[in-house]
Amino acid sequence: MRGRRRMPETPAIRKHVEIFADGACRGNPGPGGWGAVLRYHGKEKELSGYAEYTTNNQMELAAVIQALRALKEPCRVTITTDSRYLRDGISLWIHKWKQNGWKTRVKTDVRNKELWIALDEACLPHEIDWQWVKGHSGHPENERCDALARAAIDRHLREAATEE
């Protein structure tokens, strides 16, 4: 499924960047990692990060937020994720959440509200096309992002073990 988010009117849109992103968690919640691959004109940049106590959904959001923050100027962006939560949240639910003061239809706070706000802000300068792929289905970039996320967890768990 694809979702498109339009940016405000601006001069001719510039560069087209592809972002692939994934999050992982050991336990849910538990230690987590995220990975992203940014591609522009055949060149790739890999990003990853870690959180000590988090959820898989938080890591999915963090991956895209950090990837968008890495862009130095407004771009046309295609974001590919295996997270339906992320794809549906940004394409379908976020508009109502904002209208309702970041509350759900049953008047509770939106889960991961701070991350959704950060993602919304990170999206603003860009024209974004959201793509969904099935996770662990052999999609090369998604598999790479998953490996980056898992490696971030492993790296930090090893560091924590050697500090003890």
UniProtKB/Swiss-Prot annotation:
GO terms for molecular function: magnesium ion binding; nucleic acid binding; RNA-DNA hybrid ribonuclease activity. Monomer. The keyword Nuclease applies. It comes from Syntrophobacter fumaroxidans (strain DSM 10017 / MPOB). Residues 13-154 form the RNase H type-1 domain. It comes from the Bacteria. Keywords: Cytoplasm, Endonuclease, Hydrolase, Magnesium, Metal-binding, Nuclease. Binds 1 Mg(2+) ion per subunit. May bind a second metal ion at a regulatory site, or after substrate binding. Its cofactor is Mg(2+). It catalyses: Endonucleolytic cleavage to 5'-phosphomonoester. Its EC number is 3.1.26.4. Mg(2+) 1 binds at residues 22, 60, 82. The lineage of its organism: Bacteria, Pseudomonadati, Thermodesulfobacteriota, Syntrophobacteria, Syntrophobacterales. This is Ribonuclease H.
